[in-house]
Amino acid sequence: TEFEKKLYIARVQTEKILSDDEVFYIPSLSSKVISYKGLIISDHIKDFYPDLTNGKMKTSLCVFHQRFSTNTLPQWKLAQPFRYLAHNGEINTIQGNRNWYLARRNKLNIESLPELNKLHPLISRTDSDSYTLDNMLEFLLAGDMGIFRAMRTLMPPAWQNNNNLNEKLKACYEYPVSYTH
């Protein structure tokens, strides 16, 4: 929605303005997604965030992750979950993906978000691999790409050597390669 786009742009602009502040972080700024963070054990989450026990609070999905990143120094912005993802593990291609983004960021203009096109880079070169993936997913969603297509774009299945793949599906996987590889 337009409101979601405005919230996304406002958050990105604010983060750019305050980029030198190492403790400033906005866990979520959305009318649809709330990201709670806390250095707590799962049994205490209801005490730490009492609004989660309110019967008026309704959700179709909840993700809980209970540890800090293992390959970077602990920081609130790197604590799981992120704005859209919770990911445990290593993304082996992260440096290549970051370099790909930097080389193609001018191609990634989203017509519905002209203000955002001035805010590149949107992907961190130094934060965790999962955080970077979450940033890119958030960018694609803000540009009106659906969640399933965005995830397939960012993490396509191994399809190049599959001779049994029908041509329509192959074309579907080939299209985002111009954006993601």
Regions found by a protein language model. Name each.
Residues N92, N99, N106-N162:
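Conserved catalytic alpha/beta cores of large enzymes that bind or transform nucleotide phosphates
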Residues T180-H181:
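Conserved small/polar residues in nucleotide/adenosyl-binding loops
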